[in-house]
């Protein structure tokens, strides 16, 4: 007789335990055990429990390679889902085998788990292991399907349990509730939350935290009448009362300094859309700025051409917004423009706007606004640029380049890499909750009753069109942060804390990824010969980039350096990139004139006519303002059940080498966090959005 000591760990989230019957089959290189029920006196498989069992076998099974967990009915009790963390088995020779699960078993089913050692296809020689990894991929591809979201955008998850089961009620003609309460500011897709596959949706704690925070705030907005007022704001200072209890050093600074040119320019470097600005070496023909116009703002002893040659002129071009139609909001037609803004980096270290044009087409009805124009002309011109920032940020930098692309990375990973693959183990922590938050996001933003339709001047179709244009211009190099800074010509720009912090995090990730990949891939041939890896890369190119060759995305990877860069890009996109554009949203937008989602008057065609009243009448009305800010408030408040970058409580790697690499990664991140906090002590306006302590492992909000 051979005795195997078994530990079974149940998840710690609420309702992770089960009352169903759980049995175990152990498979080794020398045989297979009988199915044996795991049962002892008292409660089995309670939430958070680690249960110990003894399994007797007729013979030694040799090296353990696979186990099967069988979930079956228990007596007359109803079906009860179970979340299994892992199974650990101590063999008769005292060798301990680890079998990671970290997934739900909802129904009566059998789950086969491999021993935790990471292996690429070439490492598997036993037919049973090759068959297992092939069957796992087949099952995932049968379950997870691609679905077209909007033509021209990355495809997304379409799984059977996304849709609710058939309705069972006496009156089939009664309309179903769509998750929207008339009069309230937002729509929540309850179905997407409730019926999403268990392994993709929020934990109970995160779900409860999300709705517990959102519900009372939405109710407060309703009771205060903020979402029913379709009129203009009477006074600018009234905007501060929207969130009287939600203040920070940054939000207070924004409200006090939003009119200053230096702060306007600062936001291009360290605001919530810091990846747009480019060094300008030649003034575009469509933006006919002359030396005579801007000479007073460049300082003595220089001129526009000299500053261009020195690399001190920068351009923010919102051409991606050109020609998109607007909609009516609250009975009033909204207006739109695609501005260009020229900036100068001066010897005092300030990035200053020196010229703004509110169109991509110059002409007599499109004046170039300058800092020495009237106070309200210049302020309104800057506000139009900030309006364009809203769409550049929300549609492209935030929703497209982090959420939607991250979801495509996630789905391709689930469909093409088995759990034993080292890249699956490396990247699965960075996919946590991405599908769930995107399901909610599609209901909040991209829905006929959502934010884009009810509070954005471009409406649902226009907002989607901006994203489609964004994807058509997206390149592989732009997602690889070091290349992006060089390509935009900002690699040596002083005071660019976003660049400094993002590079620090990128290189820490790159070092970690390098150690993991070189542990499992001995040479370039192993990379090129890994069919699962190549299918993953090809599917991302096809379903995320829609097969667009001009994107520069690889369709295959042939060398270890190529694989390292690619995996680092995926990891960064699904964590730090999102943190940089998401975490500061409320701080920079709670003062609405700094980030308006709509404009109620057309862009100025003549100078000298703007007044305080016309400025107020151009800004979004009270209702539109509050709908947008409520949604952004929700997106900036990470619900409970957080996992900061480098925090990997789920044990996927068991080998000593990768475990050391994980610990070294954590230490590097801790040092980066320390450096950021020390630097911020000397700054009037701290930049902390890329502090690793504040970065989530995944896109989970």
UniProtKB/Swiss-Prot annotation:
The molecule here is called Arachidonate 12-lipoxygenase, 12R-type
Query: Where's it found, cell-wise?
Result: Cytoplasm; Cytoplasm, Perinuclear region
Role this protein plays = Catalyzes the regio and stereo-specific incorporation of a single molecule of dioxygen into free and esterified polyunsaturated fatty acids generating lipid hydroperoxides that can be further reduced to the corresponding hydroxy species. Does not convert arachidonic acid to (12R)-hydroperoxyeicosatetraenoic acid/(12R)-HPETE. In the skin, acts upstream of ALOXE3 on the lineolate moiety of esterified omega-hydroxyacyl-sphingosine (EOS) ceramides to produce an epoxy-ketone derivative, a crucial step in the conjugation of omega-hydroxyceramide to membrane proteins.
Which positions bind Fe cation? 398, 403, 578, 582, 701
Q: Which family does it belong to?
A: Belongs to the lipoxygenase family.
What is the annotated tissue distribution of the protein whose record heads this document? Expressed in skin epidermis and other stratified epithelia including tongue and forestomach. Low levels of expression are found in trachea, brain and lung. Not expressed in intestine, liver, kidney, adipose tissue, muscle or hematopoietic cells.
Also noted in the record is:
Mummy, a recessive ethylnitrosurea-induced mutant has a nonsense mutation in the catalytic domain of Lox12b, resulting in truncation of the protein by 68 amino acids. The affected mice are born with red, shiny skin that desiccates and appears scaly. They probably die of dehydration like mice with targeted disruption of the gene.
Pfam families cross-referenced by the UniProt entry: Lipoxygenase (PF00305), PLAT (PF01477)
What the record says about activity regulation is: Increased by calcium.
Stated consequence of mutating residue 441 to V: Loss of enzymatic activity
**Keywords for this protein:** Cytoplasm, Dioxygenase, Fatty acid metabolism, Iron, Lipid metabolism, Metal-binding, Oxidoreductase
What Gene Ontology molecular function terms does this protein carry? arachidonate 12(R)-lipoxygenase activity; arachidonate 12(S)-lipoxygenase activity; arachidonate 8(R)-lipoxygenase activity; iron ion binding; linoleate 9S-lipoxygenase activity
Result for mutant: residue 9 to V: In strain: C57BL/6 X SJL
**Primary gene name:** Alox12b
UniProt cofactor(s):
Fe cation
Record-listed E.C. numbers: 1.13.11.-
Give every PLAT domain span. Answer: 2-119
